[in-house]
Amino acid sequence: MATTLTRRAALSSALGALAGFALHGGATAQSARMPFPRWVEAFRTRARARGISDAAYNRVMGSLKPDTSVYALDRDQPEFHEEVWQYLNRRVSDWRIITGKERAREYAPLLARIEREYGVDRYTMLGIWGMESAFGDLVTNPKHMRPIFPALAALAWGEPRRRSYWEAELLNALVIVERGWGDPEEMIGSWAGAMGHTQWMPEVWLNMGVDFNGDGRISPYGPPDDALAGTAKYLSERGKYRAGEGWGYEVRVPHGIRASGIRPISAWQAAGVRQASGEPFPRPSERARLWQPVPEGPVFLLTHNFDAVKSYNPANTYALAVCHLGDRIAGKGPFAQSFPGAEPLPTLAEIQEIQQRLTALGYNSGGTDGRVGKDTMAAIRNFQLKVGMKPDGYAGLKLLARLREAA
């Protein structure tokens, strides 16, 4: 987040801190802290200093039990565990592309208004919305979300090395309740406290939130107006998003090119770099850097707005998925160069067939809607373990072939 920690950079630091904590068990760090009820009473002083009334504090914290399961959760973001092509195929899926096009039509007036107000392209917003909550499908899904106060309180009380961050976010969440923007019972989100359509942390809700639908409160839940507008404001103010510019280009480069750094696209052209589409670059004076995620895979020239998206999540693969999903929703095609070892992107019908075949074999895939969620991934892993495949939970064509063999 510009001068502030990025929304996910803070979480990444906290995740790293949790690694050693979880390896030794939650009890070790907790034993060095005062008992939770005493901590809650001591923390009241901090809350009062932020203008939180005793009534609001008691409502949230009075009978709260810490959700210590957060200590044992996976410590790393998935961007760092999957092959890049798997990460992209999972997120820039046929379901997300089709659903994104539907949302683009359904919310065209809202997205146009956001573009006018903040200068952020509608397809960038659709990419983030699709990535963060599957266009709202996961916002209140209990299999993906949990009450945030038990989780944040556990982290603020017992997480050893990023305690100040979690304390601040717990206070921010309490301020939201004090202002009447959110009801504690309805404030559910990720284990780390990210909420709503575009997964706002409490600090983002407080400082970047916008009452875009004019209902008198700011909320990342319900209609997506406030969530999308607040995220566009975030990209504009903290990411310095530039209106009217893209995020970058897939390119072809001469063999053995050694040029690096950030330079005008005209300089890259002089070095032999060309758009993979064969089209001329529309803004030769725009500055860009060259990036190839994996050897022998596609190569990209990344411009400023790619980094604006990274202000929301600093992982390159996240930003690439957001931008590529937005492009696919806009009607553009897949990358010209495939990733080495990549399977073709499964169609919606193929994903549905995977789910149907898993269900027929006795695995709970959670439905046959063509969206791969936690239930489908768990069912895939169980099947993969049974048949001796790598249990990566990936719903691909190799898996479909094995399922067809097992029928």
State where each predicted segment sits:
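N-terminal secretory signal peptides and thylakoid transit peptides that target proteins
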Residues: 1-18
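C-terminal segment of N-terminal export signals and the immediately downstream linker at the start
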Residues: 3, 22-50, 59
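A general alpha-helix detector
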Residues: 39-46, 110, 151, 354, ...
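Catalytic glycan-binding domains that act on GlcNAc-containing polysaccharides
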Residues: 54-285, 300, 309-321, 325-326, ...
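An alpha-helical appendage that flanks or caps ligand/catalytic pockets
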Residues: 293, 298-304, 334
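Short acidic, glycine/serine/threonine-rich helix-capping segments at coil-helix boundaries
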Residues: 346-351, 359-403
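Short, solvent-exposed mixed-charge patches
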Residues: 405-407
